[in-house]
Amino acid sequence: MKWKTLLFLLLPPLMAWGQKDKDKGKAIQSLGTKQAHYTDVAKQIWGFAEMGYLEEKSSALLQGELSKAGFEIEKGVAGIPTAFIATYGSGKPIIGILGEFDALPGLSQEAFVPERKAILEGAPGHGCGHNLFGTGSLAAAVEVKNWLAQNKVPGTIRFYGTPAEEAGDAKVFMVRAGLFNGVDAVVSWHAADRNSAGPSTNLATKSGVFRFYGVAAHAAAAPERGRSALDGVEAMDMMVNMMR
């Protein structure tokens, strides 16, 4: 994990407090000295490779790192055992940093191997870089915390440990529980093939379940009495495509 990648997550919270360029340079240098440690954290989460809502080891590792750095930990928020909030400081602004750490099914893979080579065939793996996601957010939160403490600046940095991003919608439950109320800004990042600030937007999704019920009838004697559930599915598919 290149530590410079963390800079793009680190700068928005620091700019919220009006940090000077020389202080940004110090933050970058500080991250460089901790590169090996954060790389080890990312490797551990890679090895855990835990599915959504089951990230017990990954969540505990991140909580432990934040606790050692001086954050207060609130565990099991929104009724989710692996969700947590780590907070440092007081007053405004309140800056949130998202950290994800869940894996995907069937993507077990040995690290640093360019070809497909599962650690355990059929087991989960980090196909979307969430081992880096959680670790990078951890590093940024700790560095901002250190800056607040060293400069005696009022403000709050809040790390949101958000499990089950891939399919479990844990953030939705966290929002509904009011855990983001009063936050002035929330920043996030994602592992990619380049280092850049991403101003682009993404479409949101809202899931739902649709059931179609048919009516049975004799195909030869009374076909007019039958109703095909498949007809409804096909009609909906066609009309949704037309709406797009």
Language model: regions and residue ranges:
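Short, functionally important structural connectors and interaction interfaces within domains
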Residues: 3, 23, 43, 93, ...
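Enrichment for repetitive, rod-forming helical segments
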Residues: 9-11, 133, 137
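Acidic/His- and Gly-rich active-site-bordering loop/insert found
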Residues: 20-126, 135-155
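Bacterial Sec-dependent N-terminal signal peptides
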Residues: 1-20
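Histidine/acidic-residue-rich, glycine-tolerant segments that coordinate divalent metal ions
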Residues: 117-125, 131-132, 148-244
